[in-house]
């Protein structure tokens, strides 16, 4: 059982080591711990015996072990930390006109990677939970057409396709009406189920020639199952991990699945210190944080970095960026859902943000 003083010593060593990356000796702790150097050394030895500290080869000081970082994150790290010095910089970074959702999420990933020096990942709302709210087909020529699918009344997905050679002149209109009548208002998960169960029978009923019709359904709607994901700072991973991690980051859909499955529905923030079941992430820290995309649902923000990262700094940056990001997304969707609405981050708003009044 770790004592209160030992906990304070471990916290200080973690903070000092992540800031300087130098082993910490007992004398360096005396100003903050109300005990003699000998007592501190004795507690450091006990922490080492418990596996929370380890000796450095070139110094008499100690540094946190993997277990030490895990204990610190689980027992001492405040997940609500915000450094007000970062707020203004983050707000200014989001002061641009966005033409689509992807512009905002991409900017957030770039900013998070830049400010943390780690790998940043932003994931849109989980595909299966999104709802199909619009479907149109635009015929481009005699041989090809464009399917326009709208998710959650705001996110368009376009799929260009070749019209099957066996399609009759009326088949495209039948296809359009079937989708509008059977799929509109359903979640992507429900649509996936219907494609596998009732759609084959419906195709047999409404199409004289059924060849390629099911394939066309599958082709168009397969685009809804892909994660919208933004990954920045991949090269940075080479500084804190091996080539396996870098190669893992090169497969966005695999990354999306691994990171999404690592945080449960009832968790808002989760930090895994070398605890991932994904082999490429087993020797790194992954911080995952949920944020709201207005009118649509919950999205995810992740930081992937070294085990010895500055955790308090990382938590603060994630909190600040996610909260300002939500403000930006709120303005964006408010604009889309109004007849005429202009959005500017005024100086008064910036002052309120800096005081923390708009970040709750």
From Swiss-Prot:
Gene3D superfamilies to which the protein is assigned, alphabetical: 3.30.450.40, Heat-inducible transcription repressor hrca homolog, domain 3, Winged helix-like DNA-binding domain superfamily/Winged helix DNA-binding domain
Q: Which SUPFAM superfamilies match?
A: GAF domain-like, Winged helix' DNA-binding domain
Q: Does the keyword Cell division apply?
A: no
Which InterPro entries does this entry report, sorted A to Z? Answer: GAF-like_dom_sf (IPR029016), HrcA (IPR002571), HrcA_C (IPR021153), WH-like_DNA-bd_sf (IPR036388), WH_DNA-bd_sf (IPR036390), WHTH_HrcA_DNA-bd (IPR005104), WHTH_transcript_rep_HrcA_IDD (IPR023120)
As one GO molecular function, the record gives: DNA binding
Entry keywords, A to Z: Repressor, Stress response, Transcription, Transcription regulation
Q: GO:BP terms for this protein?
A: negative regulation of DNA-templated transcription
Q: Which family does it belong to?
A: Belongs to the HrcA family.
As for what it does, the entry says:
Negative regulator of class I heat shock genes (grpE-dnaK-dnaJ and groELS operons). Prevents heat-shock induction of these operons.
Q: What is this protein called?
A: Heat-inducible transcription repressor HrcA
Provide the species name.
Streptococcus thermophilus (strain ATCC BAA-250 / LMG 18311)
């Amino acid at each position: 059982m770790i004592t209160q003083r030992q906990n304070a010593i471990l916290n200080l060593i973690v903070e000092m080591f992540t800031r300087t990356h130098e082993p910490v000796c007992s004398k360096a702790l005396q100003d903050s711990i109300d005990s003699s150097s000998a007592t501190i050394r004795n507690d450091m030895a006990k922490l080492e015996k418990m596996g929370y500290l380890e000796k450095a080869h070139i110094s008499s000081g100690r540094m946190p072990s993997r277990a030490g970082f895990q204990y610190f994150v689980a027992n001492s790290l405040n997940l609500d930390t915000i450094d007000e010095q970062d707020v203004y910089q983050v707000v200014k970074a989001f002061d641009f006109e966005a033409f689509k959702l992807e512009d905002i999420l991409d900017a957030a990933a770039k900013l998070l990677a830049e400010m943390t020096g780690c790998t940043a990942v932003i994931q849109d709302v989980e595909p299966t939970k999104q709802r199909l709210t619009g479907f149109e087909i635009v015929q481009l020529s005699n041989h090809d057409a464009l399917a326009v699918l709208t998710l959650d009344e705001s996110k368009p997905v376009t799929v260009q396709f070749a019209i099957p050679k066996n399609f009759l002149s009326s088949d495209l209109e039948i296809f359009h009406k079937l989708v509008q009548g059977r799929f509109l208002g359903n979640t992507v998960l429900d649509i996936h189920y219907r494609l596998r169960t009732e759609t084959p029978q419906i195709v047999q009923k409404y199409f004289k020639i059924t060849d390629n019709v099911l394939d066309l359904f599958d082709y168009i709607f397969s685009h809804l199952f892909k994660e919208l994901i933004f990954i920045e700072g991949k090269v940075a991973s080479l500084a804190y991990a091996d080539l396996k991690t870098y190669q893992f980051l090169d497969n966005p859909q695999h990354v999306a699945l691994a990171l999404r499955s690592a945080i449960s529905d009832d968790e808002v923030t989760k930090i895994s210190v070398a605890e991932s079941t994904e082999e490429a992430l087993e020797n790194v820290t992954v911080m995952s944080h949920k944020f709201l995309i207005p009118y649509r649902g919950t999205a995810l923000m992740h930081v992937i970095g070294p085990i010895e990262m500055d955790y308090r700094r990382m938590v603060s940056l994630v909190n600040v960026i996610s909260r300002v990001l939500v403000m930006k997304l709120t303005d964006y969707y408010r604009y889309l859902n109004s007849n005429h609405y202009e959005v500017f981050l005024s100086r008064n708003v910036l002052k309120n943000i800096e005081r923390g009044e708009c970040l709750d």
